[in-house]
């Protein structure tokens, strides 16, 4: 409709997006585990795969994706970000981490996150302090980083020969 304006809330642009993509990532990891078992490949080979020496391996890509999902929803809602040990060493453990993250993110309701567009968000990245307003944090920092790490995890597994495709990444529509 010409001239119509679409309204998208902070909640709609965050929690359901994280939930959908994390569910897709969990399914991709399940396929990767089956692939490794079928071919008698030690799963640590896939979990430690990286594209370049200075890039994180698959395990860390998944950990960072879950960190962005839980951290973003928590910060937008103004609650503490849960800390995870980052000690996953199997596909099953990574899927457990995703499940724990899904439980956390799914607990938020629209009222918890909506209205956070102007919330002050401060992060520490190495020795730098990053300051954002909620909407800029979500749209220009958190979502791009989340998608980067989910996509990199997908690409690493695809490059290793795991039989996954675009619909595995996108998921059910």
Where are these regions (language model features)?
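Conserved, structured C-terminal
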Residues: 36-41, 81, 125
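Structural signal for well-ordered, non-membrane alpha-helices
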Residues: 22, 26-33, 70-73, 99-106, ...
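Residue-level detector of short coil/turn "hinge" positions at structural boundaries
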Residues: 36, 43, 112, 164-166
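Short, Lys/Arg-enriched N-terminal segments with co-localized hydrophobic residues
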Residues: 1-5
């Amino acid at each position: 409709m010409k001239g119509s304006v679409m309204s998208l809330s902070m909640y709609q642009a965050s929690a359901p997006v994280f939930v959908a993509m994390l569910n897709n990532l969990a399914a991709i990891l399940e396929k990767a585990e089956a692939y490794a078992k079928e071919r008698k490949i030690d799963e640590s080979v896939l979990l430690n795969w990286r594209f370049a020496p200075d890039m994180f391996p698959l395990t860390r890509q998944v950990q960072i994706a879950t960190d962005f999902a839980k951290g973003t929803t928590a910060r937008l809602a103004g609650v503490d970000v849960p800390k995870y040990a980052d000690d996953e060493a199997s596909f099953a453990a990574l899927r457990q981490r995703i499940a724990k993250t899904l439980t956390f993110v799914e607990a938020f309701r629209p009222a918890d996150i909506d209205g956070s567009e102007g919330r002050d968000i401060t992060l520490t990245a190495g020795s730098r302090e990053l300051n954002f307003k909620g909407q800029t944090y979500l749209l220009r920092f958190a979502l791009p980083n989340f998608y980067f790490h989910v996509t990199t995890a997908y690409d690493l597994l695809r490059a290793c020969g795991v039989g996954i495709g675009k619909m595995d990444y996108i998921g059910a529509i």
